[in-house]
């Protein structure tokens, strides 16, 4: 009898199942800041690449298994008992701590670019698991769309782990390819808007149809019924070198990626990181320029954003030129692209000089 009383004692101290889930979600959320800023674990042992990836993959499999177990348990009645819930929560927490622990084993000297990809994958898994626990807490005992979406997110994040590049060169190529695609999309959007010669054409046509049907004054509605919604001839003239600069950005990234693919060396991690770091600034700079060409156009803003992009492009080309991926620095493609960037920028300066002087 005495032993039975002792074994039953913990039951009274355990929180209800859903309350335990709420606490678990909070605990998982608290782990995220540490992963974002945490440093690699210092060790005197030589890094074992194969062992790391094996452990990282195994840790991801464990997380996905625990996500499945937890989802099944809390998607039907009766809900698990407090004791069962405690066990589920402990297993989920342990699985998440384990994969974070493996991430901390990845040293910086293997490449900052690759380490960022490993960190991003780890953050996705932790964040998605926290969202799953929250969804199960909010929608228990049912297969709600939110629960299924959250579960699939954890599963997808774990399935992504084996697809992470295994060395810094592969990681650099992965990031550069993404940057090329982003700049390509931005350039195509700019070209499409210019071809239509009216960036807000679709929106204004819809408004005009509604207004004519209802006999409503556009000015009363505050519709953009003025030149601020269109490009002036001066705007269109300024946009031409801006488009050329965006096109040069795409060409720069493609050539840099090709140079890394053909000449990049896996052991030159620092130089690869430098190339990726500066190349990462190109896409956001193109986006800023693209946004500034929409009416009402402010020539000074266009000039500033163009100068920022031109500076980033030239710096990226110079860093690439000085690195091992360009065995012949005198290679004509680098000075050719630098000249193209300078030509675009000089034309933009000419067209905006009056704004600077006024």
UniProtKB/Swiss-Prot annotation:
Disulfide bonds: none annotated. Residues 1-189, 238-358 are annotated as: Interaction with RPLP0. The keyword Cell cycle applies. InterPro entries: GCIP-like, GCIP-like_N, GCIP_C. Phosphorylated. It comes from the Eukaryota. The keyword Nucleus applies. Residues 1-183, 149-358 are annotated as: Interaction with TCF3. GO terms for cellular component: cytoplasm; nucleus. Keywords: Cell cycle, Cytoplasm, Nucleus, Phosphoprotein. Residues 1-207 are annotated as: Required for interaction with CCND1. Pfam families: GCIP_C, GCIP_N. It is found in: Cytoplasm; Nucleus. May negatively regulate cell cycle progression. May act at least in part via inhibition of the cyclin-D1/CDK4 complex, thereby preventing phosphorylation of RB1 and blocking E2F-dependent transcription. Interacts with CCND1 and GRAP2. May also interact with COPS5, RPLP0, SIRT6, SYF2 and TCF3. Belongs to the CCNDBP1 family. This is Cyclin-D1-binding protein 1.
